[in-house]
Amino acid sequence: VRLVGSEMCIRDRSTSNTPQENIDAKWVVCNPKDMLHFSAIGYFFGEKINQSIHAPVGLINSNWGGTPAETWTPNEVIDENPVIKKGADELGQFDWWPSNTAYAYNAMIAPLTKFNITGVLWYQGESNTDTYYAYESLFTGMIKAWRKAWNKDFPFYYVQIAPYAYGRYNVGALLREAQTKSAQTTNTGMVVISDLVPDTTNIHPTLKLEVADRLSNMALSKYYGKKEIIADGPKFDQYSIEKDNFILQFT
């Protein structure tokens, strides 16, 4: 397993109001020192892929905890959609992470478009619960924009946000619904982790290995062709009411 960005994402988190071409990062061999600040889910994902396909795996770590999806999305996606624009205008400003549209994309994603990546792992959404109504359009627009920037229809696998006591009526569930609808976008896959959260007062669930296992199963099944691996669970189809019974049907 080879890594890019273990130090970059801690030391050199940067923003820009215009797309950049260069980034201060390099490939390193995976070892305890260099993976200290690397994504745990990303590492465990890469480890399982490496063990399954018996080939080197390169992982690029480009993330910033707490950020809304708007800052990872090119401005044209936001400016062309009134619903997305409304959500972006309602974002609060914070000292610890950017909420300006496209700022993280310009500095931390645009320079990576020169890499011939295989796919993307995405775990985000908690900072968009207040504007859940815009998330489906925002997220699917972002995916399409990234693929356009790479000129490649790569797989995009993401994690549905975990249950958390947000203190605001149903916003977490509504964001999860938006993420579920987003899975209709071609060549995407969503991992559900609602059963992996023993404490809904902790917004950072601790079972990272299990989340990575589900992501790697999805990649192995959908991309690497290992169809014997079951990567998707049942999906809700419809409901009906019969007397005192509420009947759910899944596919």
Over which residues does each language-model region extend?
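Single conserved hydrophobic/aromatic residue that forms the stacking wall/gate
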Residues: 1-5, 9-10
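Carboxylate/His-rich catalytic cores and anion/metal-binding grooves
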Residues: 6, 45-46, 52-82, 87-88
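Loop/turn elements at helix/coil->beta-strand transitions in domains of secreted/extracellular proteins
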Residues: 6, 53-58, 115-119, 151-157, ...
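Active-site-proximal beta-strand/loop segments in catalytic clefts of secreted hydrolases
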Residues: 11, 60-65, 72-75, 122-127, ...
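The substrate-binding groove and active-site-proximal loops of carbohydrate-active enzymes
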Residues: 29-40, 91-99, 123-136, 162-168
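Substrate-gating cap/lid alpha-helix
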Residues: 60, 161-194
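Alpha-helical scaffolding within the catalytic cores
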Residues: 99-112, 136-145, 170-180
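Surface beta-strand/loop "capping" patches
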Residues: 206, 210, 217, 221-251
